[in-house]
Structures are given as C-alpha cells and as structure tokens.
C-alpha cells in the first residue's frame, strides 16, 4: 500500500511527506501521549482502585485548561461501548475540540495509565513540527492535570 502511495505521489510531483502534510491540513493533526502512575505493592493497587472510584464520583470540569464536555464510564454504559468490549475499568473524558483522555488501571502491574489524544487545526504555511510540539505539550499538561486531580502528584 505504501509503495502505491509513494508511486502516486511521485507521478503527481509531490513527496509523501507533503501528501501527509496536506492530510493534516485537511483533517487536523493528531497527537497521542500517555502517562503511567506507578504505586508499588498491594497498597499501590488499593490506592489506584480508590483513585478510579473517586474519579467516577467526582469528575473534573477541565483538564489542562480544556473543558471536559462529557464522560463515558466503560464499567457501566453498555449502550455506549462497542459490543465487543465488555465492562472495563476505563473512564473516557470527551474534550472540547474533539480530543479525549482515557484513564484505567493496568491489568498486570500496580499502575494507573492515562492516555491523551488531541487534535489541532493546521493552516497552510504552519510549521508541522512546531504545531506537533505545541499539541504534545498540551497533551502532557492534560495528563499531568488529571494525575494531580487524582492526588498522584
């Protein structure tokens, strides 16, 4: 598939990276980051479980300065999760602008995992590397804010 794409780009006189940049400008630039909050031993497992329960009881209104527009608790809510996904210890925050944050305990280690996906609009002439760096910085700030909200930092 990639070879076909590269050949199409070559025939059109554009580079593959230019084609990718065009897709970013049309659909937005997405970045993803994650943060793992490790708490050792049985006490750590209990602390993580308590943090997840507290999160379900008291949801943040903003994360990293971005408004949380909605939440999905995959432990419940069978009507909103994919059919193939059973009940999970997973909470998803829907962010203003189309981003999301996921929080879940690890299934194998005493750690809580936070995943952040953000999208930013890119205009013609924008430096893609700089735009990606700004989005990643914002994603890290969102993950750090959720960690603080949970009392982990």
Q: Predicted regions span which residues?
A:
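Phosphate-binding and adjacent anionic-ligand microenvironments
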Residues: 1-105, 113-115, 122-153
């Amino acid at each position: 598939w990639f070879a076909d794409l590269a050949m199409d780009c070559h025939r059109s006189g554009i580079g593959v990276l230019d084609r990718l940049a065009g897709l970013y400008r049309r659909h937005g630039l997405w970045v993803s980051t994650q943060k793992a909050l490790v708490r050792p031993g049985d006490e750590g497992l209990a602390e993580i479980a308590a943090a997840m329960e507290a999160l379900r009881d008291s949801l943040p209104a903003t994360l990293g300065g971005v408004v949380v527009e909605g939440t999905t608790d995959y432990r419940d809510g069978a009507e909103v999760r994919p059919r193939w996904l059973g009940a999970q210890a997973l909470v998803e925050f829907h962010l203003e602008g189309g981003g999301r944050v996921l929080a879940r305990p690890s299934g194998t280690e005493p750690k809580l995992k936070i995943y952040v996906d953000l999208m930013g609009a890119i205009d013609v002439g924008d430096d893609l590397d700089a735009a990606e760096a700004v989005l990643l910085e914002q994603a890290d700030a969102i993950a750090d804010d959720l960690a603080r909200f949970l009392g982990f930092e």
